Amino acid sequence: IGGYWGGVSTLSPQFAHLLPAQVQPTPTKSLLEVEPALLWDAASLFGVGNINPGRLTEFYHGMHGYLAASGVDGVKVDGQSGLTAFAWPEGAGGSTGHGGTSSMVRAHVHAMEASVSE
C-alpha cells in the first residue's frame, strides 16, 4: 500500500480516520549505490501517503472485509520490501514516531495477519 502508486490520499475524507501523512522515503546509502534512480522516482519526488502505524490493523481489517464481502477469497501480497524506506515522521498524525526499515514492514505484516485471521 505504501509504495508504487502513491499510497493513500492524505486529503480524502474517507481516509481521515486513519490519520495518514505524506512521507518521503529514505533509501539506504547501499541501496542507492545499486539503484540510484530511486532519488528521482515519483515516491522520492512527491512522497507517499502512509497510514498512521496505530491505525494499520483498522485499515487492513476494512480492506479485507470489503474484499471478502465482494467474494474475494485470496490476495497476493507483494512489494513489502518497499516499505523499508518509509519511516513514520515524529509527531505526524499524533504519532510518536515508528522508525523505518524492518519496524515499518513488521507493523504492516502484523496488521495484515491480524486482519485476515478474523
Residue ranges and their predicted role:
Residues 1-118:
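Aromatic- and carboxylate-enriched substrate-binding clefts and catalytic-loop regions
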